[in-house]
Amino acid sequence: HSEGTFSNDYSKYLETRRAQDFVQWLMNSXXXXXXXXHADGTYTSDVSSYLQEQAAKDFITWLKSGQPKPE
């Protein structure tokens, strides 16, 4: 892959992974009856940090697996 294609594929992968993780996180949060209240800024920052970290871990795992990119 050229660097531009790799970056584009990586961005698409991260967007998809973040969306999946966020939906899963919401579903898990909805299952818990007691939810801790956060200020909107803190909540958004926490979710973004979690999703970025998780997407990076998943991408590294995917790179190590040598699998072709998902279409």
Curated annotation (Swiss-Prot):
Keywords: Hormone, Secreted. GO terms for molecular function: glucagon receptor binding; hormone activity. One of its GO terms (cellular component) is extracellular region. PROSITE patterns: GLUCAGON. The keyword Kinase does not apply. It is found in: Secreted. Transmembrane segments: none annotated. It comes from the Eukaryota. Induction: Produced in the A cells of the islets of Langerhans in response to a drop in blood sugar concentration. Pfam families: Hormone_2 (PF00123). The keyword Secreted applies. InterPro entries: Glucagon (IPR015550), Glucagon_GIP_secretin_VIP (IPR000532). One of its GO terms (biological process) is response to starvation. X's in the sequence were included by homology with American goosefish sequences. Belongs to the glucagon family. This is Pro-glucagon. It comes from Ictalurus punctatus. The lineage of its organism: Eukaryota, Metazoa, Chordata, Craniata, Vertebrata. The gene is gcg.
